[in-house]
Amino acid sequence: MVVKRTQTDSRMQSTPGNHNHPDAHANAAYMTPPSMGALNANNSNSQLSTLTISPMTYLANNTSTDGSFLKERNAQNTDSLSREDYLRLWRHDALMQQQYKCAAFVGEKVLDITGNPNDAFWLAQVYCCTGDYARAKCLLTKEDLYNRSSACRYLAAFCLVKLYDWQGALNLLGETNPFRKDEKNANKLLMQDGGIKLEASMCYLRGQVYTNLSNFDRAKECYKEALMVDAKCYEAFDQLVSNHLLTADEEWDLVLKLNYSTYSKEDAAFLRSLYMLKLNKTSHEDELRRAEDYLSSINGLEKSSDLLLCKADTLFVRSRFIDVLAITTKILEIDPYNLDVYPLHLASLHESGEKNKLYLISNDLVDRHPEKAVTWLAVGIYYLCVNKISEARRYFSKSSTMDPQFGPAWIGFAHSFAIEGEHDQAISAYTTAARLFQGTHLPYLFLGMQHMQLGNILLANEYLQSSYALFQYDPLLLNELGVVAFNKSDMQTAINHFQNALLLVKKTQSNEKPWAATWANLGHAYRKLKMYDAAIDALNQGLLLSTNDANVHTAIALVYLHKKIPGLAITHLHESLAISPNEIMASDLLKRALEENSLTSGFLNSKYVFEDEVSEYMQQSNLNTSDKSMSMEDQSGKVTESVNDRTQVLYADSRSEMMMDDIEGNVSEQR
């Protein structure tokens, strides 16, 4: 089809009758889009949106001088419509009713008649709806259409992205935004027609190109620029938040600094609050609570899935997994195809040990959405839950291959290596995650934990410090920093980290039981400073949270031995051996405690009494410790969603074991 440049009728050359109407200039652009050279920022229609070039918008805004609508808006009266407008409405309605052959048939005719770039844009939209991106690109790049219309340029670049021609798309869009040379003038045009500015959409598309070229720094800047150009460009905001390209503080700063000046006070508060729902749930709790309350007060929004999901996120951070499941289940009952809910829902099921539900959900997702990355994440989490690690790894890998930007899949893949002690592969996978998701602290945290397992304390400290620089509100991170300080014999720093971790747990977690190991770590640090009373208090706190922890009983016994109170030490060592009869350290300490006790209370009498007590306790070897899980704070998003809490338990519990030393003060790791 050859695009003809024919003269349109006088009706197509006009503007709305009321020239003071705020969309008058925009509607003029619909009629006669400005001719522009290649990305000429001084002569562009990039400040407009596709609303401007919609035939429905034009007819709706084309009013008479007294403000009454023209009779052309009456669908039953089309006598006064020109042939071109009649064809445009026909094409548009066919497109809205998914009658794409009809829309293409009519669209080709109106383009032949008018040669208007806007008609070319809508015909190309029809081709895009059928997945024929090559044909759409061919149409938009002939006759220099993309140089005459920003809408055509944007859509041509979009087609090239869909065709994986990254360099071609970048050539059309430009490596940087050419329209931002005069920011003051640009800001005046933000709300010209109420839609999303094409300039913002092109910035977003430029970010997509850089993302696929693995240039994440440039991609991040493009997404941020898209939002600064037009705060309504939600796609750019979602890329920044869901892919963790910004730190938690950077996310909040961006939302607060967006240009809301062109909105009313109420609309600005509404949009800002909507965006806040997507941000990190640990920092800025007061602002988040106010945003939730404001949106909940709006009639109908209390049922919004985004608002409910925000509440579920907050509960997940507080380890209230049953409450999380109640909310996510409610959302899925309303909309079972809301895939954004599944990462959090699956993580909570894993935390709760719901193997059967994970199995059913995984099968359902495989049947309904085999092409989605979250489907294979669900399968991987199920296999992780039943301890089939190799199968879990395979499906995590499949999920990350289908969507390379899907954070939970990458972290689950890395965790599967960590569980089996394959540290090199785990480090490689975590490093990839750190490169992809630059704004989240979790990959650096896991890298530090891996190097600590390998005994590389200096490297572990570097990664943990990098993690802390990104996010300071994760108690697990603070615990690990304390362990590093302990291993460097910096006991006061270790105590500070452990105390800060426990304060944060008290503030943000409803379930403190998983953090018994941190109390034990604090007790060990106090013991090393010979602050024995403080050590016993901390260890007893850990014992209250985890009554069946043999390590804590052994640690308390060790402190009592230091205090020369062998009788109480023996009592706790009996408890330890009753829980874990094969505990070598407890057995050795018991022998020493018995020897020391015999010197003060009579060797012969005490010897047989204590030996009888040990025998009695060792008969209780069938006692089982409770299965503990330590969930992590959820970052913007759902990078880990605690897909592998077993790894975290291994590290957390090993902290107490690693920090146990014998009575002379030498550290003896018990793994």
From Swiss-Prot:
Changing G412D: In cut9-T98; temperature-sensitive. Phosphorylated. Residues 1-24, 622-643 are annotated as: Disordered. It is found in: Nucleus. It comes from the Eukaryota. The keyword Repeat applies. Keywords: Cell cycle, Cell division, Mitosis, Nucleus, Phosphoprotein, Repeat, TPR repeat, Ubl conjugation pathway. PROSITE patterns: TPR, TPR_REGION. GO terms for cellular component: anaphase-promoting complex; cytoplasm; cytosol; pericentric heterochromatin. GO terms for biological process: anaphase-promoting complex-dependent catabolic process; cell division; positive regulation of mitotic metaphase/anaphase transition; positive regulation of mitotic sister chromatid separation; protein ubiquitination. The keyword Nucleotidyltransferase does not apply. TPR repeats lie at residues 83-114, 117-142, 150-173, 198-229, 234-257, 268-296, 306-334, 341-368, 373-402, 407-435, 442-470, 475-507, 513-545, 550-579. It holds the Pfam family TPR_12. The APC/C is composed of at least 13 subunits: apc1, apc2, nuc2, apc4, apc5, cut9, apc8, apc10, apc11, hcn1, apc13, apc14 and apc15. Homodimer. Interacts directly with nuc2 and hcn1. Component of the anaphase-promoting complex/cyclosome (APC/C), a cell cycle-regulated E3 ubiquitin-protein ligase complex that controls progression through mitosis and the G1 phase of the cell cycle. The APC/C is thought to confer substrate specificity and, in the presence of ubiquitin-conjugating E2 enzymes, it catalyzes the formation of protein-ubiquitin conjugates that are subsequently degraded by the 26S proteasome. May play a pivotal role in the control of anaphase. TPR repeats 1-7 mediate homodimerization while TPR repeats 8 and 10-13 bind to hcn1, burying its N-terminal acetyl-methionine. This is Anaphase-promoting complex subunit cut9. It comes from Schizosaccharomyces pombe (strain 972 / ATCC 24843) (Fission yeast). The gene is cut9.
